[in-house]
Every structure is written in structure tokens, then in C-alpha cells.
Amino acid sequence: MSDTSTGYSDPNITPPMGEAVPLGLQHVLAMFASNVTPSVIVAGAAGLAFGGAEQVYLIQMAMLFAGIATLFQTIGVGPVGARLPIMQGTSFAFVGVLAGIAATQGLGVALTSCVIAGLIHFALGSVISSIRSWFPPLVTGLVILAIGLYLIP
């Protein structure tokens, strides 16, 4: 692969300010949209008023914890974090299930399920290298396809 299109071959090169500012702004806007949208979808499924205090609170918490997780990823704390400029935030992977729980059981049950799933995810993180073979590309690809198909309507 040739790097003649960008002129950059070293990933440690800092682009000129005229390129860095628009690219950084684009990255921030993409991060903002991807962090806000799942909160809006889940709040709507829970029957919260658009722009109401509860929905605003969900969005604020999503942004706050995305910032904290990004700091953990960038700075690193002990063995946690890649120590690279990686943005962490909310995911669309859980939106279908969480919206269903919020619509039928309420927002409290939905958020409690997030805490329990987070603890399970944390526990699986220590053994992921030994169970990675259970998730071949076909399985992970089908999961991503199912997530995308759920978001169509």
C-alpha cells in the first residue's frame, strides 16, 4: 500500500494545524453523535419526554462516563488502558435489548441490567484470551449484522 495519497508514512507525524483542526473537529462531532443517539433511543423507548430532565440526565451521564473511559484508555491506570488516543463511549450493540427492557420493565430495570452486564463484562475481560476461539469472524459478523438490522425500523 502506498502512502502517496496522504504523504504521511509515520503514524507519529503531527499534521499541520490547518489539517489537524478540521480533522479533530470532525472526530469530536462523530464522537458526540455516537454518544448521544443511544441515550435518546433508550429514553424514547422508556417513554421519557423528548428534552425532558430524565433524558437530559441520561445524555449527560453517557457523555461523562465516555469522557472518564476515554481518559482511562488514553492515560492508563495500572493494567487498564491502551495508552493511546482511543475514544470510548456508548455502543449501539446494546440498544435493541435495552430499549426492549426499558419499554416493558422501565428505565430502572434497564439501567440495573447495564450495571450487571458491566460487571460480567469486566469479569470476562480477564479470561478473554482463552475464550477468543469461541468467537470466530462468522459469529461476530452475524452479531453485528443483527444489530444493524434491528436499527433499520
Regions of interest found by a model, annotated:
Residues Q60-L71, T90-V95, V115-F122, L142-I147:
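Hydrophobic alpha-helical segments embedded in the membrane of multi-pass proteins
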Residues I101-P153:
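Membrane-embedded alpha-helical modules
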Residues M1-P85, A93-I101:
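N-terminal signal-anchor module of multipass membrane proteins
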